[in-house]
Amino acid sequence: MDLKELLHGVQAKIYGKVRPLEVRNLTRDSRCVSVGDIFIAHKGQRYDGNDFAVDALANGAIAIASSLYNPFLSVVQIITPNLEELEAELSAKYYEYPSSKLHTIGVTGTNGKTTVTCLIKALLDSYQKPSGLLGTIEHILGEGVIKDGFTTPTPALLQKYLATMVRQNRDAVVMEVSSIGLASGRVAYTNFDTAVLTNITLDHLDFHGTFETYVAAKAKLFSLVPPSGMVVINTDSPYASQCIESAKAPVITYGIESAADYRATDIQLSSSGTKYTLVYGDQKIACSSSFIGKYNVYNLLAAISTVHASLRCDLEDLLEKIGLCQPPPGRLDPVLMGPCPVYIDYAHTPDALDNVLTGLHELLPEGGRLIVVFGCGGDRDRSKRKLMAQVVERYGFAVVTSDNPRSEPPEDIVNEICDGFYSKNYFIEIDRKQAITYALSIASDRDIVLIAGKGHEAYQIFKHQTVAFDDKQTVCEVLASYV
């Protein structure tokens, strides 16, 4: 596609003479620009892309998209106050609107997105509906797997990944849709056929400012699904009604406590998994899963209702298939080589931590205790730090450590967390490896140890460097040293 065709009708001001030059790529990284590319001068937390516009030109950029006009640049400039949405518009057009060629399923919610998307993908694949996946752990485009750290990729990458899925003959894509991605316009010009709500609890107030704005961002996804599509809602979520009100498409519901189209009853929890009865219409079907905890029953229900309502497949067959599914990496990931069970989990919000600890508390032997290693990420929502401490304090003994401190001093983050404790039933160890070592050293055979906050992540982010660090690997190394 040439530049003149791409910019025709675009929602932005165009400066400079637009010529029919071939567009080869769109990118935010000036170092990756080559001849024929459009450079997206995005302003991030650490760097301003406008500072690298000259570098992009030197590398061969034929146009620059920005929120700021630069009169000293002799190149086509595409200017708009909402650069992320412009990036989405240009990228979707350049890649010929790939989401319209896929059955696009978006999953939003504070917690559970990764588990639900992985379950839906596994089920679709089992029904010979090959699907792609865009999520926190990885992006599966078909044959290729990409790990870039984004829950929802940047607009140019999102459209590029979707186009790759089309080329690799995927029928569907299941994607995590973050509140930030919705509020910023990152998923604009993406056509959603199905939207799924897991739950809405406190998170990302550093970005959204207020909880009401955060809820509104989540609810936006359901307004993007056309009447020909479908929305799937957890009716037990306190903010389900706001999402339902936003919907133009038919609503499918699931839940445990309240009335729903797909409902789980008779839930039995154990260390080996969960048993429950699925109630759908007149059908009552006994189910089992290796997933642990009541909160995971919600995740299972979200996947079951989405796939069953989409494919209209045999429900009993679907339940057999989901019963064989395993949790994603870093989601209550067990290490059973020591004297007591150790679990690695990504829980990094108060609600997620509460859900995990509720599930583990029910598995505790008499006289046992929960030992929880956790911290909070730097440069992120500070309001949840005290709340995280209060959650852990209700269930067991806390070992407070660093998570991904980013630009903040780890000691400052830990001190803010500890302001939330009412008692002195906690221990501070800033070094995460030493914190894990300490927790394992004090655990008895009747205890359960939870290493929370990082899950699948194999790194720690500090102010000036990112270092290799894997919670599960660290646990295994420490336990092996005891032998």
UniProtKB/Swiss-Prot annotation:
Source species: Chlamydia pneumoniae (Chlamydophila pneumoniae)
Domain of life (superkingdom): Bacteria
Documented EC number(s): 6.3.2.13
This protein's name: UDP-N-acetylmuramoyl-L-alanyl-D-glutamate--2,6-diaminopimelate ligase
Subcellular location(s) per record: Cytoplasm
GO cellular component labels: cytoplasm
Broad class of the protein's primary localization: cytoplasm
Biological process annotations from GO: cell division; cell wall organization; peptidoglycan biosynthetic process; regulation of cell shape
Gene from which the chain derives: murE
Cytoplasm recorded as keyword: yes
Pathway terms, separated by semicolons: Cell wall biogenesis; peptidoglycan biosynthesis
InterPro entries given in the database record: Mur-like_cat_sf, Mur_ligase_C, Mur_ligase_C_dom_sf, Mur_ligase_cen, Mur_ligase_N, MurE/MurF_N, UDP-N-AcMur-Glu-dNH2Pim_ligase
